Amino acid sequence: MITGKTHVTGIMGHPLGHSLSPIMHNAAFRSLGMDWIYVPFPVKPENLKAAVEGLRALGVEGVNVTIPHKEAVLEYIDDIHGTAALIGAVNTLKFDDGTVRGYNTDASGCLRALEEVTSVEGSSVLILGAGGAARACAFQLAEKGASDITILNRTPEKARLLAEDMADKLGFEASYGGYELIQGSVKSADILIDTTPVGMHPHTDDRPLVGAELMHEGLVVHDLVYNPQRTVLLREAERASAIPVSGIRMLLYQGVEAFRIWTGRDPPLDVMEDALKRVLNRD
């Protein structure tokens, strides 16, 4: 039962119809018997400042932040934590005695998903795409000791800007270019991360940017798309005896880290994962 003592968390963005975060977090709260709830807060860009101040005033514990607010919200928070400051975007806010702190758990989620199957330190990484998720992964993996990172994007200029930002903030010299460089780049990569929406529901049969013929045995292939769980890219990885990593892993681990930030407790990983898979299998 929701009462005046119930601790409130949630997610704010626009639109929000696709979010699986309420399912994942509410399953964890129920499993632990916590008087907490996670709800969606649709917030249009023009209402972002008012939303942050309103959540602060209402005593909300924290929220996830999604498109299109991850960068814009920086203007309205008091403190930004760790890697999030380098990335220049946050996906998690914690309200603590009137102070609003920002975190980027996409970054740690990407790292943990990869570390289930490989070591990032000393690895050669190829990232497809140059948007917010690509930024989070690139900065986190550079900080964790990747030997080299190549960023390829449909618009090479955007990849160049990300690489230059990494050089300015980390002193890390990433390579960059357009998709015409994919073939040569995959050959030398230990880890491939596709941050593009190619293959996302309902366009599940779209040809991936990298097919099995370009992959090699042992290549770690992380597709950030999680619906479907087994994308065409991951099926191609299996054909090539590469190592597929589903987007559900990053989704799960970014949620796990946000849960810890808000509650100070370790969530039941298996419960959160089962809740996600039940919904995705139903869809």
UniProtKB/Swiss-Prot annotation:
Transmembrane segments: none annotated. Keywords: Amino-acid biosynthesis, Aromatic amino acid biosynthesis, NADP, Oxidoreductase. Homodimer. NADP(+) binds at G129, A130, G131, G132, A133, N153, R154, T155, P156, E157, K158, L224, G247. GO terms for biological process: amino acid biosynthetic process; aromatic amino acid family biosynthetic process; chorismate biosynthetic process; shikimate metabolic process. The active site is at K70 (proton acceptor). This is Shikimate dehydrogenase (NADP(+)). CDD domains: NAD_bind_Shikimate_DH. Its EC number is 1.1.1.25. The lineage of its organism: Archaea, Methanobacteriati, Methanobacteriota, Methanomada group, Methanobacteria. It comes from Methanothermobacter thermautotrophicus (strain ATCC 29096 / DSM 1053 / JCM 10044 / NBRC 100330 / Delta H). It catalyses: shikimate + NADP(+) = 3-dehydroshikimate + NADPH + H(+). Shikimate binds at S19, L20, S21, T66, N91, D106, Y226. SUPFAM superfamilies: Aminoacid dehydrogenase-like, N-terminal domain (SSF53223), NAD(P)-binding Rossmann-fold domains (SSF51735). InterPro entries: Aminoacid_DH-like_N_sf, NAD(P)-bd_dom_sf, SDH_C, Shikimate_DH, Shikimate_DH-bd_N, Shikimate_DH_fam, Shikm_DH/Glu-tRNA_Rdtase. Belongs to the shikimate dehydrogenase family. Pathway: Metabolic intermediate biosynthesis; chorismate biosynthesis; chorismate from D-erythrose 4-phosphate and phosphoenolpyruvate: step 4/7.
